[in-house]
Amino acid sequence: GEYVRLHLDDRSTITTLFRLKNMEAALPSEMFMRVHRSYIVNLQRIRSYVKGRVFISDSEYVPIGENYREAFQRYIEAHYQNL
């Protein structure tokens, strides 16, 4: 198995024995998107997108994986004007 670490709004974390692929399938796709082989982001928490990075706060970001970049870019273009 694999461990998945969930980062919560209050900066706490929960670690669970779960495959990221299964977590991705369980989460609502209109709210979460896989952006890297190691990361799923809450789309409502995106602050900005700069040079292959999704910022979820002013200083915290996750990288966009090459295999996920095109789908993420399509999402951004469809949902955000000023991001």
Predicted regions and their residues:
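Conserved binding/recognition cores within well-folded domains
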Residues: 1-57, 61-63
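Eukaryotic intrinsically disordered, low-complexity regulatory linkers and tails enriched in Ser/Thr/Pro
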Residues: 67-83
